[in-house]
Design a protein with these regions (language model features):
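Sec-dependent bacterial lipoprotein signal peptides
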Residues: 1-13
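Short, solvent-exposed coil/turn segments at beta-strand boundaries
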Residues: 30-34, 50-58, 73-76, 97-105, ...
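Beta-sheet ligand-binding and adhesion/scaffold domains
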Residues: 40-41, 81-121
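N-terminal glycine/threonine-rich, aromatic-flanked beta-hairpin/loop signature
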Residues: 41-86
Length: 121
């Protein structure tokens, strides 16, 4: 009986609607910039916690996302789709960018929320 229930559950999970398609070809400008954990980290230069967002890529210390599209979600958030690349793997996926504090703080969600970043001057 448990096997039947598990198969039904998996069947229902496979019926989930796909996410809506991206409506933009690039990351919205409000997210573009260099972001770090603190202004002191910004002054120190690019370190392990720096996130750099451009119109066509998002750079993390250990990976790179080549942007293929974006879908705004309200005034302060967007899903950014693209091709991820690390030293050991490549895959297609998405991240969510969320602005807070009047655009001064960036939250990046990629399965889990990263430490919030402040916008570097």
């Amino acid at each position: 009986m448990r096997a039947v229930a598990a198969l039904l559950f998996l069947g229902l999970a496979a019926c989930d609607e796909p996410p809506p398609p991206a409506t933009l070809q690039a990351t919205p400008a409000k997210f573009v910039g260099t972001w770090d954990v603190s202004l002191d980290d910004c002054k120190a230069g690019r370190g392990g916690s720096t996130v750099i967002v451009t119109a066509d890529e998002v750079l993390f210390s250990d990976s790179h996302l080549a942007v293929t599209g974006a879908l705004p979600d309200g005034a302060n958030a967007a899903r950014v789709d693209g091709h991820f690349k690390t030293e050991m793997a490549e895959w297609d996926g998405s991240i969510r960018l969320e602005l807070a504090d009047g655009g001064r703080t960036l939250n990046v969600v990629n399965g889990s929320t990263m430490t919030p970043r402040v916008k570097c001057p």
